[in-house]
């Protein structure tokens, strides 16, 4: 099982990796190995237009994640419509509610949108962040108690 630190690092890395995914072509490029390419609704183009990034794993080659709300969907079938599936499972996604192209937003509009994306990240990963902080605090407390115990040649009960 991953430690909270590993999950935290992975979550922050995903937030960083996805910051450039406002660009349709960047999202589309992630679908190079997408299993559905023609004669279906969930082509790479339609997936990228709906805000998805292809995030395959060894066991799940069709995992797609919205770069904005971080909703992961898998088990795609040829007749699945990316916009419909996305809105069914993440109706409050800020990307879905855009009324114009990201490139047409004002600086204020873009900053508001990016703020919403970061809020989505914290909503999804807040427990991971808190668990990581708690583990770090516990480890720091233990190190300090051990240090002072060694400095003053006394024993300190770490359980109380």
UniProtKB/Swiss-Prot annotation:
BIR repeats lie at residues 27-97. PROSITE patterns: BIR_REPEAT_2. One of its GO terms (biological process) is mitotic cytokinesis. It is found in: Cytoplasm; Nucleus; Chromosome; Chromosome, Centromere. It comes from the Eukaryota. The keyword Cell cycle applies. One of its GO terms (cellular component) is kinetochore. Component of the chromosomal passenger complex (CPC), a complex that acts as a key regulator of mitosis. The CPC complex has essential functions at the centromere in ensuring correct chromosome alignment and segregation and is required for chromatin-induced microtubule stabilization and spindle assembly. Stimulates the mitotic kinase activity of aurkb/aurora-B in the CPC. Does not appear to exhibit anti-apoptotic activity. Belongs to the IAP family. This is Baculoviral IAP repeat-containing protein 5.1-A. The lineage of its organism: Eukaryota, Metazoa, Chordata, Craniata, Vertebrata.
């Amino acid at each position: 099982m991953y430690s909270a630190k590993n999950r935290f690092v992975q979550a922050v890395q995903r937030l960083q990796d996805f910051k450039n995914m406002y660009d349709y072509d960047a999202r589309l490029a992630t679908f190079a190995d997408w299993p559905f390419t023609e004669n279906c609704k969930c082509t790479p183009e339609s997936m990228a237009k709906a805000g998805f990034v292809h995030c395959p794993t060894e066991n799940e080659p069709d995992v797609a994640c919205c770069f904005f709300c971080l909703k992961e969907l898998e088990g795609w079938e040829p007749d699945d419509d990316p916009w419909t599936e996305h809105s069914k499972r993440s109706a409050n996604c800020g990307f879905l509610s855009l009324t114009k192209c990201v490139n047409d937003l004002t600086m204020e509009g873009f900053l508001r949108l990016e703020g919403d994306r970061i809020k989505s990240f914290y909503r999804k990963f807040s427990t991971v962040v808190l668990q990581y902080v708690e583990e770090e605090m516990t480890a720091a407390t233990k190190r300090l108690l051990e240090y002072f115990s060694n400095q003053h040649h006394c024993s300190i009960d770490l359980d109380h």
